[in-house]
Amino acid sequence: MEQITRSSLLIQKMVTGAPVVNLFKQWNIVCEQIPFPKTETKDLPTHDYSSKNGEDAYIPSFIPIKAYDLAISFYYTGDLDSCYTNIFKGFIAYLQGTPPVNDNYDSITEGGFRIYDRHNMIGRQKVYLKSFDPENLVHISGDSIQFKLTFRVSDPSTDIVLTDPNVKVTL
């Protein structure tokens, strides 16, 4: 049985036929920390009467969950001067997607991606890159960089599972 490690993060663009990408196999990127997402419900309509204790709240039978930010810590190590090509021109460019070629909204496909953490067995869809924070870039007999990415999870409740392609894929 294959050992599942913290590096077992899979990503798939939300485009029909897009390949599943294993970050370690594709770009030699290891996930150092993937926290469990904080679950917070949406605010309910309330009215706070000054003459009464507490508040008057409408509590429905189903309380929806808010979208949330997910900050993941990564580590990359590779050949000398490979960081720019693999991280910035490779991985980050993959997450950003490609700009539309024109303003014809019928030709623009949905952006974002699916993400699956095999260690915690949590998968979400409609995820997009929110910020990139490089922490340490070291050039000693190769490149090493620690960085954090913050993702926005706009669909906090749909569970998805992605299967590891076990190989580097063509993007």
Can you say where each PLM-predicted feature lies in the sequence?
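Extracellular/virion structural assembly segments
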Residues: M1-L171
